């Protein structure tokens, strides 16, 4: 079987827990003991090691341009750290803010809107997804 390529939209707390879990339990297979929180060790013939994060997008200036492993532990994230995620080689690209950001985040997240500076220009999301499929 092949890999399941995944793009992360928003490198926040949920993404942090997901990526930590993918790394911590990457050796789990059909014969492994059941892990609390993981409903199935194998699903449709795929294991967690088959999930490959190929792209990540965010609008937070603290995260854009960093490796995903670094962005997931930025100051605005407060998910419990249960696994030290190694450098993934996945740069967080600037996502879209055409409809703004949520009211609960607008006072916490600094968004760079200056397209002439690094991280201020919205990335070519479609192009990135096509290139990394």
Identify the role of each PLM range:
Residues 1-133:
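N-terminal glycine-/serine-/threonine-rich beta1-alpha1-beta2 phosphate-ribose binding loop
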């Amino acid at each position: 079987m092949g890999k399941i390529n995944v793009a992360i939209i928003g490198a926040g707390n949920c993404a942090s827990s997901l990526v930590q879990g993918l790394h911590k339990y990457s050796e789990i297979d059909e014969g492994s003991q059941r892990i609390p929180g993981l409903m199935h060790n194998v699903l449709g013939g795929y294991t967690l090691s088959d999930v490959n994060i190929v792209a990540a997008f965010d609008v937070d200036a603290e995260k854009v341009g960093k490796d995903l492993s670094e962005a997931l532990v930025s100051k605005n994230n407060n998910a419990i750290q249960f696994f030290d995620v190694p450098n993934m080689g996945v740069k967080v690209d600037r996502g879209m803010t055409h409809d703004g950001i949520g009211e609960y985040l607008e006072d916490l997240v600094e968004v760079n809107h200056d397209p002439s500076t690094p991280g201020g220009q919205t990335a070519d999301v479609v192009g990135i997804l096509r290139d990394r499929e």
